[in-house]
Amino acid sequence: MTASLHIILDTDPGIDDAAAIAAALFAPQLDLQLITTVAGNVSVEKTTRNALQLLHFWDADVPLAQGAATPLLRPLRDAAYVHGESGMEGYDFVDHQRQPLAKPAFIAIRDVLMNAPEPMTLVAIGPLTNIALLLMHYPECACNIRRLVLMGGSAGRGNFTPNAEFNIAVDPEAAALVFRSGLEIVMCGLDVTNQAMLSPDFLNKLPALNRTGKMLHSLFNHYRSGSMRTGVRMHDLCAIAWLVRPELFTLQSCFVAVETQGEYTAGTTVVDIEGRLGQPANAQVALALDVDGFRQWVAEVFAYAP
């Protein structure tokens, strides 16, 4: 199968990010042109190191650029309590000499977009700081973005505060700018990612699959978004799944606003499912997932990896 969709992946590895990067690299329908890192699950130095380790593990020839070290206006609040102090606890990666590009992520994204023969798809599975910086410094790049597919937000409960999902809550100002930008946005939030559970039976079969399965199984043993006994949530993998298997998702066009001011609600995505605010839709919001189909696709795409 010939890869038909050229993508840029903005990420903050992160254990579930590792699974998403594997899918982005090895799904035959995708052509991963650039990886950019951002502070989120852990510091940007650690997310960059983790992404480089993964690229070396797979001997993947994909350029990588390091991005923002802090949110636009706030100090970083990370998720090391979920992913471990390094961000990818549980597997000993071998040493390597790989280095990121000598330019920041938002400039690297600009360069790839402006040199592409047609608009490209951005996939953001961390805080939206790099995407906001791109739009702030190079608004003309918006014409070269086919769509933005993101993992973030929620139409209901949060996982970082009572109402806010982690990726949006880390940098609400960046997220607010992105949702106001006019980009075509597909939002894969907690409404679907909490359904995206890999069962214990699925997880136990990973080591026999290939060396990627062994590595991911080791990481998942240290992942605190679920457990090996009850299943683990593959939040970030949903964004990649939508690119390849959109029919697995139920989407609704909605107006989405990001709260930036509330003492208790900053980072909340206000998803106007019923149209009460009278604002035009600015996102396609994923609200339901075919879980069995998702698991089948994950098994297929992991099998493509070495």
Swiss-Prot record:
Keywords: Glycosidase, Hydrolase. It comes from the Bacteria. InterPro entries: Inosine/uridine_hydrolase_dom, IUNH, Nucleosid_hydro_RihC_nonspecif, Ribo_hydro-like. It is an enzyme of class 3 (hydrolase). The active site is at H235. Hydrolyzes both purine and pyrimidine ribonucleosides with a broad-substrate specificity. This is Non-specific ribonucleoside hydrolase RihC. It comes from Salmonella enteritidis PT4 (strain P125109). The gene is rihC.
